[in-house]
A protein has these predicted regions:
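Bacterial N-terminal signal peptides that target proteins for export
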Residues: 2-13
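Cellulosome-associated attachment modules in secreted, modular CAZymes
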Residues: 9, 24-28, 768-867
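Hydrophobic core
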Residues: 14-22
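N-terminal module-boundary/linker segments of secreted carbohydrate-active enzymes
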Residues: 28-132, 309, 313-321, 376, ...
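Extended ligand-binding clefts on enzyme/binding-domain cores
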Residues: 57-69, 136-280, 289-293, 317-723, ...
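Long, well-ordered hydrophobic secondary-structure segments characteristic of membrane-embedded
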Residues: 99-109, 122-135, 276-280, 284-303
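Short glycine/serine- and small hydrophobic-enriched flexible loop segments
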Residues: 106-116, 300-308, 409-413, 501-512, ...
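Long C-terminal extensions of eukaryotic subunits of large macromolecular complexes
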Residues: 715-767
Length: 867
């Protein structure tokens, strides 16, 4: 029955349904209506324009960008995802990351290159806005960020100090091992003095902190709604995204547990990690951590723009400054000698000459962290006032997917960037870093082709002695999954496609412009030979292992599928500085999952294939045929097929996304977060912070979130039914439009438009499959995809689907829907079968009162949308 409130909206559709003859299902183009809108599927340039319009130009309207910005001349701050319930690296979708900021720089660089070359409409200038937006995550350049109750923090005070010191502390495997033990050995950054000399007039380091709460959801900014720097992961390799304790980067001792300290009333949240047993153990301070793959992506963006004829002006200098200071990421955590194998080993001296430094590994490690005092408790007895101490640490662990030899190449050899790095020894360091990074990939490439994990100078996080079986790379030992073990950090296929894209783009520049190293050898190979060796094996493996019209073990059908997760066995041989094609025959990976993959993963794979093809002068015609025998030509064809299929099946009203399901989300409701015994405090929003709390307990703000409430209702229903943990989220589906996914899709469509403007997407006339599809997310979950609203199974969602539903409701014998159509059409209160509400909701999409991405929805949300 149709309610009175629904009659007005349904009248037209109902009349059509009652007067229509039987609906005859028709075949449609493989592209859905969003994919073809404005002719977007006719060329990759149009594809880029269509997606850029949704994500950047109208990003605020479509939910990608916040109203908060970094002042005039910037875009809105990009969220990690449009949607809110998103627990992976960020623990809330409307946080942002340095990753997202680097994509903002990268996609705006692509926009300006394409506009400058008249391949798309519009003008240049977006790159400058993109970089200004990125600077919101650089503390001293963040125009509107929360800066404490006083409204400002002097980050330049860092340079007033002669040295920065850290206390050597063990890394414990489990969160329960924290607060960890200090051993009394002081650690000093030996190149701090060089940065002070070069950049002492700046407002601190020109590095991005990795995470921020875009609109102060956690309220560490006092509930102001301001952009607020926060941090999470702090407690060992087993601390998953469900086990972190969020904390503000500006620790004002306003939250946490009440204490009888004579100077402060609260411990601060950092006390959970660092302890609170003695007065002054946690002082008012700021602290930040970078993730250098993001800085390197931003540097890559500027180099890309420059290599394609854009005058980047001051941005080249800023990118160089950022790269110069990323040398902080080339050092052991506590500046101990590489290969020391003892936590009691002394660190390099703060005054060490560059030639005497022993702690520099030259790779891009997982982070550098720094911070300092804002108002010490003993300031009343301190004539120098505030800001009288600071700390810094490097990182002992290096992962293959954090390396960016393309950025290192630019910083070492580009005439503009190399000259713009002001600190001493920067160019020499990057020449050595570039060499080490290429060798790193040669060392880690498996027999199959994908790259194994990485290495560490601190085995077990405690500088343990190496075993005789540990393979070594410049006196650091091999680690299968560096940094994180829940889940292991090198299972996800994204680690492969991100890193290899950089190698392929570098290969393209070397082939087209020559080798700027002027004959440097890498494991005995020239640069071109080394890159070709790495790429040929890797690309060959992906071509062999990519599937079309794939059906998984559960019967889920996919238009295409790439490997989604890898398990590893064996180890590489110890690196002896000479490459051997057979040295790693015992190092292999096994595909443990196939999927349509993250949008970003498929896109980045295609980007790699396009650059490899262009480097090898493959003609555009190869993209239009399967009759290729050359590997590079086969790669270009595969890129065209994957990009076309992804666009045609996953394009929706605001971007590209598939329906998702993450079985591990039950941990949101059940996972205990370790809080040390004796601690009994509160988060800024009043959430309890004491032993026994769960992820949800310390994030009570989630209780107001509609996505969270939907997930919780399904969890509780399944829990009451006695389902096992693996099945507690059965029936829970959603879409996530991640900003980095859109970023990689934009870069890849743009790259095809730039390098192969004559290649056309594949748009065969064939039935659109709306069957369920398994995909993998960054958490390694499995998902199902249905074309919500497509009741007549014609591959698009229109008023005709509402008509089909109403006809079936009125006379199911005469107007029977297909089984898949019934599933597709059940968009309101999913699970109760098709009703008039479903028809109403579909018509509301046509009337722009709902978005297709809102499906499935509830009766309550339907009523609210009608106003």
């Amino acid at each position: 029955m149709i309610s009175k409130k629904n009659k007005a909206l349904c009248a037209g559709v109902l009349a059509a349904a009652m007067s229509a003859s039987a609906i005859v299902p028709t075949f449609a183009s493989a592209a859905n209506e969003y994919a073809t809108e404005g002719g977007a599927n006719e060329s990759y340039a149009k594809m880029f324009e269509s997606l850029y319009d949704d994500v950047i130009t109208n990003g605020e309207k479509n939910g990608y960008l916040s109203k908060n910005n970094n002042g005039s001349g910037s875009f809105g701050i990009p969220y990690h995802a449009v949607e809110t319930l998103c627990v992976e690296a960020p623990d809330y979708g409307h946080e942002t990351t340095s990753e997202a900021m680097s994509y903002m720089a990268w996609v705006t660089a692509m926009h300006d290159v394409l506009a400058d070359k008249k391949l798309i409409s519009g003008s240049t200038g977006d790159l400058q806005k993109g970089w200004k937006t990125l600077e919101a995550l650089i503390p001293g350049w963040s125009a509107n960020a929360y800066a404490g109750e006083k409204g400002e923090i002097d980050y330049s005070s860092l340079w007033k100090l002669e040295k920065v010191k850290a206390d050597t502390t063990t890394e414990e495997p489990e969160p329960s091992g924290y607060p960890a033990k200090q051993n009394g050995v002081d650690a000093y950054n030996p190149i701090f003095k060089d940065f002070k000399s070069a950049y002492g007039s700046d407002n601190g380091y020109y590095l991005m902190h990795w995470l921020a709460d875009v609109e102060d959801w956690y309220q560490f900014g006092g509930g102001s709604g301001k952009f607020t720097f926060i941090n999470t992961f702090q407690r060992g390799e087993q601390e998953s995204c469900f086990e972190t304790v969020p904390q503000g980067c500006i620790e004002e001792l306003k939250y946490g547990m009440a204490v009888s300290d004579p100077h402060y009333k609260m411990t601060g949240i950092k006390a959970v990690v660092n302890g609170w047993q003695k007065e002054g153990q946690i002082a008012p301070q700021y602290s930040f951590t970078n993730a250098p793959d993001a800085e390197d992506r931003a540097i890559q963006a500027i180099y890309f723009a420059s290599m394609n004829g854009l005058d980047c002006g001051e941005l080249s200098g800023l990118a160089a400054k950022m790269g110069d200071q990323c040398r902080n990421d080339m050092f052991d955590k506590y500046y101990k000698a590489i290969g020391c194998q003892s936590i009691d080993a002394k660190s390099d001296e703060a005054t060490a000459s560059h030639s005497s430094i022993k702690s520099q590994h030259f790779l891009m490690a997982w982070y550098t962290a720094w911070g300092g005092s804002t108002f010490p408790w003993y300031a009343e007895n301190n004539p120098s006032g505030n800001y009288d101490w600071a700390f810094q640490i490097g990182c002992s662990h290096s992962h293959q997917f954090y390396q960016n030899p393309l950025a290192a190449y630019a910083l070492a050899y580009d005439p503009v960037m190399s000259k713009a790095m002001k600190a001493s020894d920067a160019v020499d360091d990057y020449k050595e870093s570039f060499k080490r990074q290429i060798e790193f990939y040669l060392w880690l490439q498996s027999k199959n082709g994908p790259f194994a994990g990485g290495c560490t100078n601190s085995k077990g996080g405690q500088y343990q002695k190496y075993d005789s079986s540990d393979p070594l790379f410049y006196d650091m030992c091999y680690v299968e999954h560096p940094v994180y073990a829940d889940p292991g950090s090198n299972h996800w296929i994204g680690n492969q496609v991100w890193s290899t894209q950089r190698l392929a783009e570098l290969y393209y520049y070397v082939k087209k412009n020559g080798d700027l190293t002027k004959g440097e050898k890498f494991g005995g190979l020239s640069l071109e030979e080394a890159l070709e060796t790495l790429l040929t094996r890797w690309i060959g493996w992906f071509i062999e292992n990519t599937e079309f019209d794939y059906v998984d073990k559960d019967g889920n059908e996919m238009a295409y599928a790439i490997p989604s997760n890898l398990d590893w066995s064996g180890k590489p041989a110890t690196w002896n500085k000479t490459y051997s094609a057979t040295a790693n025959d015992g190092l292999t990976c096994e595909i443990t999952g196939y999927s349509q993959g993250d949008i970003g993963c498929v896109s980045s794979l295609c980007n790699t294939l396009i650059y490899f093809a262009a480097a090898n002068d493959v003609k555009a015609s190869a993209a239009q045929t399967d009759d290729n025998t050359d590997l590079a030509a086969q790669g270009l064809r595969l890129a065209n097929k994957l990009m076309s299929a992804q666009w045609n099946t996953a394009r929706d009203d605001i971007g590209i996304a598939y329906e998702d399901h993450n079985g591990s989300l039950y941990r949101v409701f059940e996972q205990e977060v370790f809080i040390p015994d004796g601690f009994d405090g509160k988060m800024p929003d009043g959430s309890p912070l004491k032993p026994g709390v769960t992820f949800s307990d310390i994030r009570e703000s989630y209780a107001k979130d509609s996505m969270y409430k939907d997930a919780k209702a399904i969890y509780e229903k399944n829990k009451a039914a006695g389902k096992t943990k693996e099945d507690l989220m059965d029936g829970h589906t959603y879409k996530l439009h991640r900003f980095w996914h859109m970023g990689d899709a934009l870069m890849t469509t743009g790259t095809m438009a730039l390098l192969y403007p004559d290649v056309t997407p594949i748009n065969d006339d064939e039935p659109v499959s709306s069957s369920t599809t398994s995909t993998a997310t960054t958490t390694g979950s499995t998902s199902t995809e249905t074309l919500w609203g497509d009741a007549n199974c014609d591959g698009k969602v229109t008023v005709a689907d509402a008509t089909a539903i109403l006809q079936a409701v009125a006379n199911k014998d005469k107007f029977e829907l297909k089984a898949q159509g019934k599933l597709n059409g059940d968009v309101v209160d999913n699970g109760d079968g098709i009703t008039a509400k479903d028809a109403l909701a579909i018509q509301m999409v046509d009337a722009k009162l709902l978005k297709l991405s809102d499906f499935p929805t509830t009766s309550e949300k339907l009523e609210a949308a009608k106003g």
